[in-house]
């Protein structure tokens, strides 16, 4: 939770792309022309503020706005920063009418901007900094909490095998189990049971 208004400002909006996250914008434009349906330039690139483990950019054109998520540059752990996994999940949920941004394309060619990335629609929305929703009427809070519960319930009702996510669940659990190791035996036992269920 970000409580201080000054802290909120640090996490809100966009900024110029920081030097360590810059890339060849001309190559990105060429890729978008070939891979993003309906794309028309010119393109302006901004970077979202805040602490994302994967650098996130706002791609602005006169006609539409997009969001790009990429792996950070540098040496990474093999299973870390899996934006390709993000794209796979979003691509599976979007056709079902689940409230995620429309995904356009995943680029696994690191010659384009240096790392794997994907592009999706930019959706406007508010940020609920405090989960207690201060300043709202009880009826407003009720509506938001109810919508949140329904959205999570809808997600849990997705047939993940039919959605093409089979194998992904098992992989994620295996990675988590490996990460936990012997540090939490009770949690590791629960994950082991879950691994059996995903077979």
Model-derived regions: residue spans:
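Juxta-kinase regulatory segment immediately upstream of eukaryotic protein kinase catalytic domains
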Residues: 2-39, 43
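ATP-binding pocket architecture of kinase catalytic cores
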Residues: 42-198
